[in-house]
Amino acid sequence: MVGVNGERGRRWRVVVLALAAVYFLLPLFAAAEFSLRAPGGGHGLANWVAIARDPVLIGALLTSLQIAVITAVLVLVLVVPTAVWVRLRLPGLAGVMESVTILPIVIPPVVMAAGIAFVQANLGGPVFRALFASSTTALTPFYVVLALPFAYRAVDNGLAAIPLRTLVEAARNLGASTATALLRVVLPAIRSAVLGAAFLTLALVLGEIVIARILLYTDTFPVAIVEVGRSTAGVAVALSLASLLITWALLLAVSFAGNRRSRSGGSG
């Protein structure tokens, strides 16, 4: 009886996995097929070639990647020391930090974008003019705010999985400063969590469109996809697939880096 139940359970798992694969992969195959349709009929790489030959699209992709990298660095600089400090010195504020960092999820991006647009239109001065002079300087601070909920929880979960206080106290007893303990002891121990937070930030920036669209910054990759889709749907679908492939490549890079670190730590 146990063997029959086990066999039945395995069959159900196979069925569920097959249905999940169809659910996720079928739309991707359909999108890939649509992106390969030629304007005159048949199939070809015309839509993908159009992306490679369009300097506006390439520039938008590079701009979004630049914003994503800067945002990820700023988020980690803010989140990692804060999360470590809260766990070590102010554990009573853990609930407050959870509530504060979740606010960007609670507040709709449209509301945030409307407030930013009001500031952009009504507040002058050299600081605000310099801030809104380009999409990189204008969007990066707000993307940092949007990424805080995801990055903070990823880093905080990583800290919860290690004996943080023991590691820091051991490093301090050996003569290391707080900064040295953070950089050379804590950070390597939570490298997978830090890489996960960076990946979530990159994925968010590469997909965010509301704030950029309302603030009229059209030189970002998500906005470029929408603009192209108005005239050439095939190119827009190819752009969406390219964005997905870039995100997957980043995820694989993060996973590879984390696994390599784990193997090297285990062998050492």
Segments the model singles out, each with a brief description of its role:
Residues 41-45, 218-220:
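Extracytoplasmic catalytic/substrate-binding loops of multi-pass membrane glycan-assembly enzymes
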Residues 8-40, 53-160, 185, 189, ...:
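Membrane-water interface segments at the C-terminal ends of transmembrane alpha-helices
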Residues 257-268:
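Short cytosolic juxtamembrane segments of multi-pass membrane proteins
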Residues 171:
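The alpha-helix within a helix-turn-helix
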Residues 43-53:
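A short amphipathic helical element positioned immediately N-terminal to and/or at the very start
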Residues 1-7:
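Short, Lys/Arg-rich, polar N-terminal cytosolic tail immediately upstream
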Residues 156-167, 178:
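Membrane-helix/interface signature in polytopic inner-membrane proteins
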Residues 174-175, 188:
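Glycine/proline-centered hinge or cleavage motifs at structural transition points of membrane proteins
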